[in-house]
């Protein structure tokens, strides 16, 4: 869509340099940042097997869609800024760009919606999430997302073609295949997903708030002591058995079966306290992604609706509408492509392990489990100290008279299982 679509008067072929140059610089920075960030995201996830989790698979899909959106849109967008007409790329490129852009946009919003549902199930219905293979389910959902994105993009893209205004060629809508297609797109791929996401986060927030009330003030105080510890993943090593259990919701449950000599009630209490704080960090990360998505994409859909309804307002208001449309075109264009480089930045800032793996890839170092966990060894000691200090006011050990005494078979070392060890490893948050 171009400003020329609002009037048969195409106007000047280029806006003033005071607008064109800054916008070009912004587009260039977005393109470089987005391409580097999304390609690096894919490489980091692919090379590090410990990051082959459901959440990272969604992130991988998101990076692919963002990269395709940048590749198909920014070069032609910059070309259009410097020369609004004539369109020199031909009809095939015009239609192909529409197909790729619509597919990528649809895949982005569907992916964000999908892993929001994934987080809701993991936090509010953990037993349901553990009953199914999260990784295999994520793969199936991602494949379905891309199929839906392509199928719904084809009718949109097929409407594009080369149109002629006063003998000047432009890329625009030349045929109507689906009536009210852009209105439907706004509802299906923006309003409905955002409503679903907001409702699910509200339910998650209520669930976490109720969990806080159940745990009581002592648990809140303990969580305050854990705030200095990164929560990529917290593992609990119990009674020297050497069996670790992930508290990020992404494990298979094998760690639970390997625990020896422990109290189920105590283990549940420890798991709840540690997992609660880690879940809140995961939640903040996903909320940030969703909020940025809304801020970046709302102007894009608003600009589309203005382009559709503004011409019907009448000739007297046409100039005002054209000014608003022109401003919205620049604002929505910048924010539209800015969304493609925000996701890698958000995940790098909020995930210690991803940040370490990202730096390792950038500096050409081999991505290894040990290199990603070097800092976590220090943080594990901080975690142990925090838990030791908190136990002075309320010990969460199994030294209670209500707990059965461990047998020799349960504790081969014949040491009291109160010697619980806590360790941090660099498993990506799932």
UniProtKB/Swiss-Prot annotation:
Residues 1-16, 75-96, 162-185, 303-321 are extracellular. Residues 388-413 are annotated as: Disordered. The keyword Transmembrane helix applies. Residues 38-53, 118-140, 207-281, 343-430 are cytoplasmic. Glycans are attached at residue 5. The keyword Cell membrane applies. Keywords: Cell membrane, Disulfide bond, G-protein coupled receptor, Glycoprotein, Membrane, Receptor, Transducer, Transmembrane, Transmembrane helix. The chain crosses the membrane at residues 17-37, 54-74, 97-117, 141-161, 186-206, 282-302, 322-342. GO terms for biological process: G protein-coupled receptor signaling pathway; negative regulation of peptide hormone secretion; neuropeptide signaling pathway; triglyceride homeostasis. It comes from the Eukaryota. Belongs to the G-protein coupled receptor 1 family. This is Pyrokinin-1 receptor. It comes from Drosophila melanogaster (Fruit fly). The lineage of its organism: Eukaryota, Metazoa, Ecdysozoa, Arthropoda, Hexapoda. The gene is PK1-R.
